[in-house]
Amino acid sequence: MQIKLANPRGFCAGVDRAIEIVNRALEVFGPPIYVRHEVVHNKFVVEDLRNRGAIFVEELDQVPDDVIVIFSAHGVSQAVRQEAAGRGLKVFDATCPLVTKVHIEVAKYSRDGRECILIGHEGHPEVEGTMGQYDASNGGAIYLVEDEEDVANLQVRDPDHLAFVTQTTLSMDDTSRVIDALRARFPNIGGPRKDDICYATQNRQDAVKQLAGESDVVLVVGSPNSSNSNRLRELAERMGTPAYLIDGAEDLQRGWFDQAARIGITAGASAPEVLVRGVIEQLKAWGATGAEELDGREENITFSMPKELRVRSLI
């Protein structure tokens, strides 16, 4: 069995920044540090931070007074921000800047009273945060659609004064079809010059298409609640290659590889490389050879840290 590695894979700039914010807050202020929602959707990362003193909660009413709170990379609604401010909580915002970009777009449509359509998955924390940027008191409304059927059934007030945005971690192919359906139904709809799916999601989906074409089985390292990791598995399967989403080497089943000569490995944007290395070592123990890195798009994007953590971490 030969191992092939997708390129790029694993951590993106937004995930790197979010994890580093929690780590630096722990270093500078000491535990406990409260984090609203899992800072990124990866079991290994969350457990590591929990062991260092991070406490993960789903709502601010689980947070005591006079503590530090970090908002996860997925972003939060304006109501959550207002609740934190009203309680005087010290907040560090680990929202991915590319998610913040979508928040700014939605807030602008809200101020203009322009109806907005969000393409995304119901219940995902990024979607909840983005929907929560819209203030309907200005006369508009925000709607959530997941697929073409939702578009066909959507009723809006003013079809000539619409705009759309997208969740950042969607399937590019699926989203393109939904956007086409929106434009067909609402010819005057506005939106970003390109969809809001982030560079890392696009790059990893392009890479897994290449990987699936050169593999008999594809392994996607990522947690089950990771949207972008699930999209990678689905994409490999659509390419006709069996694919499995795994948290790490402990999830591997030897029977998956009985008929496989080429095993492809990729990782979602919230999965650390150490987990990929663990998978490679287990496969090698079962007789796999090599670990060929496929050609791919180089990523050199970084996002800045909050000023207080940048300065105090140098003391």
UniProtKB/Swiss-Prot annotation:
Top-level enzyme category: oxidoreductase
Binding-site list for [4Fe-4S] cluster: 12, 96, 198
GO biological process terms held by the UniProt record: dimethylallyl diphosphate biosynthetic process; isopentenyl diphosphate biosynthetic process, methylerythritol 4-phosphate pathway; terpenoid biosynthetic process
Taxonomic lineage from the root: Bacteria, Pseudomonadati, Pseudomonadota, Gammaproteobacteria, Pseudomonadales
Catalytic activity entry: isopentenyl diphosphate + 2 oxidized [2Fe-2S]-[ferredoxin] + H2O = (2E)-4-hydroxy-3-methylbut-2-enyl diphosphate + 2 reduced [2Fe-2S]-[ferredoxin] + 2 H(+); dimethylallyl diphosphate + 2 oxidized [2Fe-2S]-[ferredoxin] + H2O = (2E)-4-hydroxy-3-methylbut-2-enyl diphosphate + 2 reduced [2Fe-2S]-[ferredoxin] + 2 H(+)
Binding site for dimethylallyl diphosphate: 41, 74, 124, 226-228, 270
Pfam families: LYTB
Presence of keyword Transmembrane helix: no
InterPro entries registered for this protein in UniProt: LytB/IspH
Enzyme Commission code(s) on record: 1.17.7.4
Source species: Pseudomonas putida (strain ATCC 47054 / DSM 6125 / CFBP 8728 / NCIMB 11950 / KT2440)
Cofactors: [4Fe-4S] cluster
Pathway: Isoprenoid biosynthesis; dimethylallyl diphosphate biosynthesis; dimethylallyl diphosphate from (2E)-4-hydroxy-3-methylbutenyl diphosphate: step 1/1; Isoprenoid biosynthesis; isopentenyl diphosphate biosynthesis via DXP pathway; isopentenyl diphosphate from 1-deoxy-D-xylulose 5-phosphate: step 6/6
Name of the molecule in the record: 4-hydroxy-3-methylbut-2-enyl diphosphate reductase
Residues the entry annotates as binding (2E)-4-hydroxy-3-methylbut-2-enyl diphosphate: 41, 74, 124, 168, 226-228, 270
Residues the record marks as active site: 126 (proton donor)
Keyword vocabulary terms for this entry: 4Fe-4S, Iron, Iron-sulfur, Isoprene biosynthesis, Metal-binding, Oxidoreductase
Keyword presence, Transmembrane: no
Amino-acid positions noted as binding isopentenyl diphosphate in the UniProt annotation, renumbered to this chain: 41, 74, 124, 226-228, 270
